[in-house]
Every structure is written in C-alpha cells, then in structure tokens.
Amino acid sequence: MANLKEIRDRIKSVKNTRKITEAMRLVAAAKVRRAQEQVLRSRPFADRLARLLENLQARMRFEDADAPLLEDRPLETVTLMAVTGDRGLCGGYNANIIKRTEQRFEELQSKGYKVNLVLIGRKAISYFTNRSYPIQATFTGLEQVPTADEAGSVANEVFAEFLSETTDRVEIIFTKFINLVSCKPVVQTLLPLDPQGIADADDEIFRLTTKDGDLRVETGSAPANAQPELSSEIVFEQSPDQLLNALLPLYLQNQVLRSLQEAAASELASRMTAMNNASDNAKALAKTLTLDYNKARQAAITQEILEVAGGAAAVG
C-alpha cells in the first residue's frame, strides 16, 4: 500500500505542476499579444521617420554636410549589445542569445578588434560577469512591454560612446520574433546609422482563441503601412545637416525600441511554448502514473483475494 501512496502523491504533484505551467502559458500568451500590438502601433511613425531621413540623406549628397552618427570611420573598437531576459522558464531563448554573443565576440577578437559588452537582462549579466568579459554597461528591470524611456536610456549609453569615439561601431544581438513557434537570434548594426527602411511587409500576426477549452492560435498577415513618398519640393527652414543631426538620435532610439520589442515578444513566445510543452508533458505523465496506480491497485486487490482464499482453504 505504501507504493500506492507514493504513486498517488506523484500524481497529485504532477497535476499541481500542470496547473502552474498552464497558468504561466496563458499569462505569456496575453502578454505576447500586447507586445505584438505595440510593434504594430509604432510602425507608422517608424516608417515616416525612415522616409524623412532617406530624403534628407539624398539632399545631403550634394552638400558638404556633417552627420557624426553616419560617419563610417576605421574600425578599432566594437560594442556588442546583448538582449536577454531577467527570468528563465523560456526554453532556449536566453541560452541562444548568449551563445550567439560569444560567437560574435570571438569573431571580432580574432580580427584584432577590441570588443566591449553592453548587457540587457539579468541572464546575460550573470553569465558574462562570472566569466570576466569586458562589460561596459548593464541594464535590468526593463518592462516586458518596453517603453520609449527605457529604449532612450539604452540608446544614450551607446550614443555617447560613439560620439566620443570610444567605440567605432555598435552592434545589437537580439531575438527576432518570426512567429509564435519560431524566433531567431540576429546581429544588427546600430551605429553608424544607415536608414534604409525598418518595416517588414506582410508580417505574421495572430489571434488567440479557444477551442474545446484549449488555447488555439489563428495566424494571418498584416500588410505593411503604405506611406506616401515625401515630395522633393518640400522646403526645410533649417539646413539638411541640422535636421539630420536632430532626427538621427530619435531614429537610433526607435531602432533600439524596436529591437527590445522584438526581443520581448520572442521571450514571451518562447515562454508560452515552453510552458505549453511542460503542460503537455505533465498531462502525459499524469496519465501514465494513473495507469501505473490502477495496475498496482489491481495487483494489490488480487493479492488480497488470493490471501483470503488461501486462508479459507487452509481452515477448511
């Protein structure tokens, strides 16, 4: 009977664990939906800003203008920004970013460049600090739906380093959100800036629904926002280089914000997938344990019957 009690306790523990993972899955699903909506809401502004910068750059080709954030100088020092989460329970999300950062760090060092790290998220900070990597700055406690203020504080750090020529290039490593089951670590150059458009056409969007009590995902496509071209006859009161130097920091902040938003959506999607797998595994394990319990109980009952029958035969 002790064996039966152990199995019952395991079944109870597995079912309680499944309740927790299912709740975490639903919370992550709700948050990843909000993260996606934030990206879509910010896209029209990003599109218009990118087109304006392209227009200004085109005019500056014929003028002797100075834009420090566009300066492509000889490469000696590179700053790598790695974006991870503050928490775990999200599958391989954090490990994949850390692995890609190490690979890029070694690639740059093998070419003779000095490399510094700017780390976002406790997982990256803990890993690289324990291994004595050169860390320039760290950021923690960012919201799961990143804000412009948070992106501004991160952008200002690398902005100052680039303008002071402490670093010659800034790259950001984050997880690009493709869809709910697919995320990819990518490396993008932040500085020097190269505004060439930042919105992807026909991004996948999704709707969370329920069917037979289970969470379901319906996917679809969101067409890119059609923005009218800027007229070449627009007259600016300020010179193009003044406007460009005023808008480029805003563009940099927007790029950082979009990267943080992509990373946040990827983390939440990874957590939702991990918790979904954990819930499915818990359900399967509970089913297996229930079968084991029934077999053990049946065997115990059979044994008792045999003992009673044997005792009766002995008495008779």
Swiss-Prot record:
Signal peptide (UniProt feature, chain positions): none
PROSITE patterns: ATPASE_GAMMA
GO molecular-function terms, A-Z: ATP binding; proton-transporting ATP synthase activity, rotational mechanism
Keyword annotations of the record: ATP synthesis, CF(1), Hydrogen ion transport, Ion transport, Membrane, Thylakoid, Transport
A Gene Ontology term for the protein's cellular component: plasma membrane-derived thylakoid membrane
Location relative to the cell: Cellular thylakoid membrane
Principal localisation: membrane
CDD domains named among the record's database cross-references: F1-ATPase_gamma
Organism domain of life: Bacteria
Membrane topology of the entry: Peripheral membrane protein
Family as reported in the entry's similarity comment: Belongs to the ATPase gamma chain family.
Subunit structure: F-type ATPases have 2 components, CF(1) - the catalytic core - and CF(0) - the membrane proton channel. CF(1) has five subunits: alpha(3), beta(3), gamma(1), delta(1), epsilon(1). CF(0) has three main subunits: a, b and c.
Function recorded in the entry: Produces ATP from ADP in the presence of a proton gradient across the membrane. The gamma chain is believed to be important in regulating ATPase activity and the flow of protons through the CF(0) complex.
Name of this chain's protein: ATP synthase gamma chain
